Regions:
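Flexible active-site lid/hinge loop adjacent to a nucleotide/diphosphate
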Residues: 226-257
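Long, well-ordered amphipathic alpha-helical subdomains in the mid-to-C-terminal portions
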Residues: 56, 286, 297-374
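Glycine-biased, low-complexity coil/linker segments
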Residues: 94-99
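Canonical P-loop GTPase G-domain recognition
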Residues: 245, 251-309
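Nucleotide-state-sensitive switch-loop elements of NTP-binding domains
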Residues: 40-51, 56-89, 100-106, 111-114, ...
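Long, basic/Gly/Ser/Thr-rich N-terminal segments
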Residues: 1-58
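Short, structured coil segments at secondary-structure junctions
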Residues: 216-217, 241-242, 280
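Short hinge/gating elements
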Residues: 41-45, 109, 171, 247-252, ...
Length: 374
């Protein structure tokens, strides 16, 4: 080895060059950003009441969090959003930021392939074009990865997604239907406090989600396809009976004739169902979300429903009934949370689960044993 280069190691060659940091500076900035993403309660409330979408989104994220401190703060925010500036509980139809404007919550369901995304965008653009502020939410307890199809639908609702009077939010989270429903309902409260006077709640997936959405909205709309029976569409009679309007989508081109025939059939069918306690007979109509044909009429149907229900007091009574249901659900959730997080119960549960699994104890005996000393 050349004596002149004898002591030139890799380190000595790099002499004078500042060594790289041991910690990724960008990672630190991201960590600090995440820590600071949660605001104080007054900051959340100020942003929500001003209609700040960024803060509204952060507040919804706070609601979705499972951390106990986040949940406590979320409840503070929700309580304030449900009050008037005087501190009184809100009348059923008055939004905090709406200054007395009547709002309406609309549930929208339909089988896959019915054109729900296109329909929501078409009706949504019509609603915002009339000067309303629209929030689009979803209820989907089924997906742990995609968080509901509305995430994909949002990219298909390009025009509505960039509408300054529209706010699109994916499903609260995957998990139990009750948990998702609670978070969706709380998201509705925040959106209304932020000035969104029209809220669409979309059901994603199948099963009991339609019933849950019905329990949190004022008007329930069922999208149908022409040329397919109920069995092929996977629609149960109970879901049809829940609907305030049955809209046959894709009524255009070669499909228009079949859509008209289907409309006549469904019109006959709804008259055979037991009458609603409100006296409202579900309206059957056609539309083409693709061409926007019939979309304005659907909004007129919704307004006619709201006017009729308000005149007879059904609208208010429905909201009050929903509040009572929320109250009982909240009790059940609180009791379950306190029960399952109790240290003594958690330990005993694990022991009893082993005995039930092994067959040395049947489930009913295990339950009796769990509550024997309580």
């Amino acid at each position: 080895m050349d004596k002149g280069n004898k002591h030139k190691s890799a380190l000595s060659v790099q002499a004078g060059v500042e060594p790289p940091s041991q910690v990724n500076a960008e990672a630190i900035r991201n960590l600090k950003s995440r820590k600071s993403s949660f605001l104080s309660t007054p900051q959340y409330l100020e942003g929500i009441f001003e209609g700040n979408r960024t803060i509204l989104s952060k507040a919804i994220t706070l609601i979705e969090s499972s951390r106990s401190d986040h949940q406590a703060q979320a409840q503070e925010i929700i309580s304030e959003c449900l009050k008037t500036p005087k501190g009184d509980l809100l009348p059923p139809l008055q939004g905090r930021a709406g200054e007395g404007l009547s709002g309406i919550r609309i549930g929208i369901t339909g089988v896959p392939g019915v054109g729900k995304s296109t329909f929501i965008e078409a009706l949504g653009k019509h609603v915002t074009g009339l000067g309303h502020k629209l929030a689009v939410l979803a209820v989907d307890p089924s997906s742990t990865i995609s968080k509901g199809s509305i995430l994909g639908d949002k990219t298909r609702m390009e025009s509505l997604a960039i509408d300054p009077n529209a706010f699109i939010r994916p499903s609260a989270s995957s998990g139990s239907l009750g948990g998702v429903a609670r978070k969706t309902r709380e998201t509705i409260y925040l959106c209304e406090a932020a000035g969104f006077d029209v809220v669409f709640v979309e059901t994603v997936g199948v099963g009991q989600s339609e019933t849950v959405v019905k329990s949190m909205v004022d008007f329930f709309l069922l999208l149908m396809l022409a040329g397919a029976g109920d069995e092929l569409q996977g629609i149960k009679r109970g879901i049809i009976e829940m609907a305030d309007a049955l809209i046959i989508n894709k009524a255009d081109g070669d499909n228009l004739k079949k859509a008209k025939i289907a409309a006549m059939d469904y019109t006959k069918a709804v008259h055979l169902f037991p009458p609603s306690h409100t006296g409202w007979i579900p309206v059957v109509d056609l539309c083409s979300a693709k061409t926007h044909e019939g979309v304005p009429k659907i909004w007129e149907i919704i307004l006619a429903f709201q006017t009729t229900m308000l005149q007879h007091g059904h609208f208010q009574r429905n909201r009050m009934s929903q509040n009572r249901q929320v109250f009982h659900q909240a009790i059940e959730e609180k009791l379950a949370d306190q029960f399952y997080t109790h240290p003594g119960i958690r330990k005993q549960l694990l022991e009893l689960e082993k005995q039930v699994t092994s067959g040395s104890l049947n489930p009913y005996q295990a339950v009796n044993s769990l509550f024997a000393d309580r």
